Amino acid sequence: MTNSNLRTENHFDYVKISIASPQRIMDWGQRTLPNGQVVGEVTKPETINYRTLKPEMDGLFCEKIFGPSKDWECHCGKYKRVRHRGIVCERCGVEVTESRVRRHRMGYIKLAAPVSHVWYLKGIPSYVAILLDIPLRDVEQIVYFNCYVVLDVGDHKDLKYKQLLTEDEWLEIEDEIYAEDSTIENEPFVGIGAEALKQLLEDLDLNQIAEELREEITNSKGQKRAKLIKRIRVIDNFIATNAKPEWMVLDAIPVIPPDLRPMVQLDGGRFATSDLNDLYRRVINRNNRLARLQEILAPEIIVRNEKRMLQEAVDALIDNGRRGRTVVGANNRALKSLSDIIEGKQGRFRQNLLGKRVDYSGRSVIVVGPKLKMHQCGLPKEMAIELFQPFVIHRLIRQNIVNNIKAAKKLIQKADDEVMQVLQEVIEGHPILLNRAPTLHRLGIQAFEPKLVGGRAIQLHPLVCPAFNADFDGDQMAVHVPLALEAQTEARMLMLASNNILSPATGEPIVTPSQDMVLGSYYLTALQPNFKKPNFGDNQRTYASLEDVIFAFEDKRVGLHEWVWLRFNGEVDDDEESKTPQETKELEDGSKLEIWNFRRDRFDSQNNLISRFILTTVGRVVMNHTIIDSVSKT
């Protein structure tokens, strides 16, 4: 940690998530004010006073615990303005500071009875069950007050350590222990609820168990061995992180900062509040009721029922619906617990931390762009003008079209031809990155040269779809603009779609035609047996070049699958042809005509080729012309 220019910067090597000890949970929420007063414990379920609309003291929005709700102003209003910074009001006990501290200052609730953490109890796998080597069903029976568990067998011969007993079984054993003729001196000790679970976890000697398990593994096979390995893996993790198993049972629960679970006043005077406040309120109410019952020495059955209800309230706060009935609010909607806020696609990690929106990026639906080159993509004008706006503004000012940024922005909003011309110049040679989620391999994000198109959809060449695993049934893709010259160079040299033809995983081509392209190629080159082949010399069906055939097709003088004779002096590759011509004719001028199945070759007396006519279809001519045209351009 270094201190420079009065700013403290933290340099981390890594972030680690581990179980928090009860003391650490208290430390998160407990603070000593400048006047020496210790605050942090939330003891009241109230949120705000309905008359004054100010937070209640020691409640879920308490200003003494979490900080003032207005900048530099205490609860009672005695101290206002920044000049009183750091002073603790002697009347209300609120520290005069910025209100933004309410975004990170935490509190805690001291529980009247230990409570099991639902993640470790009901998670898959259940770490509590694995550590104790007790089936999960039995652990739940203990935690939710259905069965007793033997913590100490004493002198009783029929009992075993960690054995489960029902209410009736324990009453029978009690009668046996306290009978007049009883010989039991050391009484067995049983427990129930999370307290018993905590006792069992405290009794574990992890190092000794690890040694015993390692010896047992050497002589075990099959399913038993797999179970032992699973258990030793959990134990080793506890040892490596210096975490104690009993920390899976909570003595205190943290209360997250109030600005992360806000309460907002609506127009009609009503309040909208975060679900967490309702869940915290349930916990505090039940905790306070349990503490009161313990104080007045209420019957055990009532106290036990209250402890079970406290356990269920904490379960709902941490992970609502994981066990038992889901807690619902108004309109029978399930309340969002801490787990719901963290997990899933809309959770804190994926939505806010990993999936942040970045500048110079956009998103739209993709449609097929068959007329594009492989390294090109169609970028909607509306999107391009927004993404490249700083570049366009710079060029407009440099070309003296406008004098300042404000005028440039006004001109851009009109989107006239002048702006579009400048935009065209800007995007010329400036690659953009296209990304399709999920990005499972490096070809999930590739660079393309943008081409301005109308509409609001991004056009994508069909050949690059396999790399993105994209199709055109409503898929969306993200656009990013590389800004630095180095980033643009890297995008052009390494990430351009035409440079990523082979799969990095297998080395095989990933750019392969499929679906429409294969079907189209087949239809174009298919031979129709029903069409009559013209005789050689038929002037209606004889053409001097590929272009002449295409012109005739465009004029609708010939159909796509009709046979034609075409003069073509290039090499012809035909698997169906035999090695020798069907017939050879000597012509009057001394030349020679070779008659093949699908071609007629004419040679002079020195055996030089004079002309070659091939019998083919219009579709095959179109296909060959397209290939020759594209190859000659590259």
Swiss-Prot record:
Question: Which Pfam families does the UniProt entry name for this protein?
Answer: RNA_pol_Rpb1_1, RNA_pol_Rpb1_2, RNA_pol_Rpb1_3
Asked whether the UniProt record includes ATP-binding among its keywords, one would answer: no
CC terms in the record's Gene Ontology section: DNA-directed RNA polymerase complex
Look up keyword Transcription and say if it applies. Answer: yes
What enzyme class is recorded for this protein? transferase
Q: What is the required cofactor set for this protein?
A: Mg(2+); Zn(2+)
Positions binding Zn(2+) in this chain are C74, C76, C89, C92
Extract the InterPro entries matched here: DNA-dir_RpoC1_gamma, DNA-dir_RpoC_beta_prime, RNA_pol_asu, RNA_pol_N, RNA_pol_Rpb1_1, RNA_pol_Rpb1_3, RNA_pol_Rpb1_3_sf, RNA_pol_Rpb1_clamp_domain
Q: Which domain of life is it from?
A: Bacteria
What catalytic reaction does the record list?
Answer: RNA(n) + a ribonucleoside 5'-triphosphate = RNA(n+1) + diphosphate
| EC number(s) from the headed UniProt entry | 2.7.7.6
Keywords of the record, alphabetical order, are: DNA-directed RNA polymerase, Magnesium, Metal-binding, Nucleotidyltransferase, Transcription, Transferase, Zinc
GO function terms (MF aspect) = DNA binding; DNA-directed RNA polymerase activity; magnesium ion binding; zinc ion binding
Q: Which Gene Ontology BP terms does the record give?
A: DNA-templated transcription
Residues recorded as binding Mg(2+), renumbered to this chain, are D471, D473, D475
Instruction: Report the co-factor binding details.
Output: Binds 1 Mg(2+) ion per subunit. Binds 1 Zn(2+) ion per subunit.
Q: How does it associate, per the subunit comment? A: In cyanobacteria the RNAP catalytic core is composed of 2 alpha, 1 beta, 1 beta', 1 gamma and 1 omega subunit. When a sigma factor is associated with the core the holoenzyme is formed, which can initiate transcription.
Its biological function? DNA-dependent RNA polymerase catalyzes the transcription of DNA into RNA using the four ribonucleoside triphosphates as substrates.
Question: Which HAMAP family does the entry link to?
Answer: RNApol_bact_RpoC1
Family to which the UniProt record says this protein belongs: Belongs to the RNA polymerase beta' chain family. RpoC1 subfamily.
User: Under what name is this protein listed?
Assistant: DNA-directed RNA polymerase subunit gamma
At the highest ranks, the source species' classification is: Bacteria, Bacillati, Cyanobacteriota, Cyanophyceae, Synechococcales
